Each structure stands twice: as structure tokens, then as C-alpha cells.
Amino acid sequence: MQLANRMQTLSESITIAISTKAKEMKAAGIDVISLSAGEPDFMTPKKIRETVKNALDNDSKSGKYTPVPGLPEVIEAIRAKLKRDNGLDYKANQIVTNIGAKHSLFNVFQALINPGDEVIIPSPYWVSYPEIVKFCGGVPVFIEADESTNFKVTAEQLKKAITPKTKVFSLNHPTNPTGAVYTKDEIAAFGEVLKGTDIIVTSDEIYEKVIYGKKFHAVASVSEDLFKRTVTINGLSKCGAMPGWRFGYIASSMDWLIAGIKKLQSQSTSNISSIVQIGAIPSLLGETDEDIENMRKEYEKRRDVAVEIINAIPGLSVVKPDGAFYLFVKCKDVDSDSLRFCKKMLEEANVATVPGVGFGMEGYFRISFATDIESIKRAIERIANFVKSYKI
């Protein structure tokens, strides 16, 4: 007996593996500080909690099946959000809710990718992108960014990576793990490269409201051509402090693709939790915007403190991110083997971080500042002492 061949292409999520190890160490009584998981430490906004409590007691729809794409009122709330925040006008039948944005991406690639199709992925990348592509039979093609461009790839790099087999350009903006945010002109340049092709853009915009001193531009909003070829993917896990609720969604003007995704979801998960859908409505309608902005301000304070302390540690350096809640820290001068470095850090300094190799780039590690400022300071102090006495 054995697993299907397609399972041989799939690797365990390194972020989840490290987070799990850190929790096991904590359970064993070890004082571990985890900066590994991209999980907001804030409580889900009160308005959302109250909405769900009320629905459980008074709404006959709570706990019932819903249409596969989602409740009509949830779809309308997503439409309103996309129009209000991003200037995007989608029809109700062009939106599908999913069990988090990871499920959204999985559905999109399952519906699009044939064996051998190439998907262009900027590197560093979120750990699950290439794994999902490979599982669907596709071939990840990486274009690498570095500190010289603030970890942003260029239109020229995209142009050089395109082949007759290219099916998708997969963009994450703001980016995990680097926090890179693309400008309107940079996105427009991607659009110019893609004109005249059948290449589809997937734009994962899950961190859109965790942004510092920049203006966010949804990819599909930049030009009519990009609107026609882009699948917008978003959710409430990061910006809305609802990671465990698992609420994501897909929006696209490509009716044939949305129809295919609905068909796929009807034979897999069907609808997402009715309670989660009801709870998402206040956030989608902008009723928790004040909470989201307060969280963003706190993230910004944490970012500034963490960047200053890390850049004072000999052997380490970090580019200040414009978005998300991660720092992608360079450790090449200490150890270019990021997996070894992070493993020793966890075992010897009791600080959990994620090795850069999981994001496609050696000599770096990622820390999340989605935790309280005192824990961040204590963790970085441990990292500094660890680096000072580090031996390969």
C-alpha cells in the first residue's frame, strides 16, 4: 500500500512544521519565543464576535448549508469591499468564498493548470506557492529578486521568463516574506509585458491593509487588460485578525474560470462555514476599519523597533518592509545554511524563526512581528547573543 504518486511532489509546510515544533517545546516547559507563524496576536474585532453570537441565537441561516459560492449577502459585501477599497466592479457571479486564501489559491491552480504548464513565481515566495503548483501538475518557474530592488522583480525579468508553456504569473503583493509592495507603475509594466498573451495573473492581496507609508494598488485595478486577465485573491486572516476562521475569496471577470472553480468546490468542500460567512460581513462592509487601522499602527511600531535592533547586530541586516508583518533577515555572514542556522537557534536560543530556504532564498531567515513588542525585544536579544557565540 502506498500514497498516490502526486503526493511525492508535496513537501510539508516549513512554517507550520516549525510553529508546531515550537508549540511542542513550550508544552514541554521550555521558554520558547515563537516568531515563526504569520498569525496576528490581536483578538478578532468585537463587532465580528458580536455578530456571530447574535446569529447563532437568532439567525435561521446560521449552521445551515449555503450556496457553494457563499451567502448572497456575503457576496454583496465582498462586491462592496472591492468597489470601495480597490475600485473594482465585479458581478455577483464572479465571486466565490473559500476556506482561507490558501484554499482560494489551491482552487485556482487546480482549475487552471494542466501537466507541464509553467507558473512564474517571484522569489522569495510564500512557501506554499510552488508546492500547490507542483501538486496540480504544473512547473514553478522562479524569477529572483534581491535587496537591490527591495525584493521586487521587474517587468524585464518577467519578459525573459515567459515561454510558450507559461500559463500563470503568480504575484503576492504585499509580499510574504519580504513585505515588498509594488507601485502602480511597476504593476502597469507587468501588464505591458503580458499584453497580447493568454497568461493569467493570480494576485494574492491578503496583506493589502498591512502597509506602511505606501499606497496599495490592486493589480486588477491598474488597467483594463489586467482586470480581464487577473484573479484577485484575498481574505480576512491577516488584516482582519481572523486567521482561524478561514475566510478567503476569489474574484475574477473570467466567468469560465469562476464557473470551473464553483464546480470544483461543489465536489470538494461545498460552501464554507455559514457562521464564518456571517462573521465576515462587518469587516467586508468596513465596520472594523478602525480596528484594522489600530492593528496596522501597532505593527508599524513593532517593525520600526525590530529593524533598528536587528541592524545593530553584527552579521545580521534587514531591509525595512513596506507591508505585511515579517522581516526577512540576512544572515549570510553568520551562516549561509539557513535551515541549520534556524534549527540551532531554536534548540540553543529557544527562538523559533523560519529559514530562508523555505522561501527559495538561502542565507536569510524570516521573523514575524505579529506578536507583542516585549516578546519581540526578548527574542531579538536572544538572537543577538546566539549570533555572537555562533559556531558552525
Q: Which role fits each region the language model picked out?
A:
Residues 3, 7-13, 18, 23-31, ...:
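PLP-dependent class I/II
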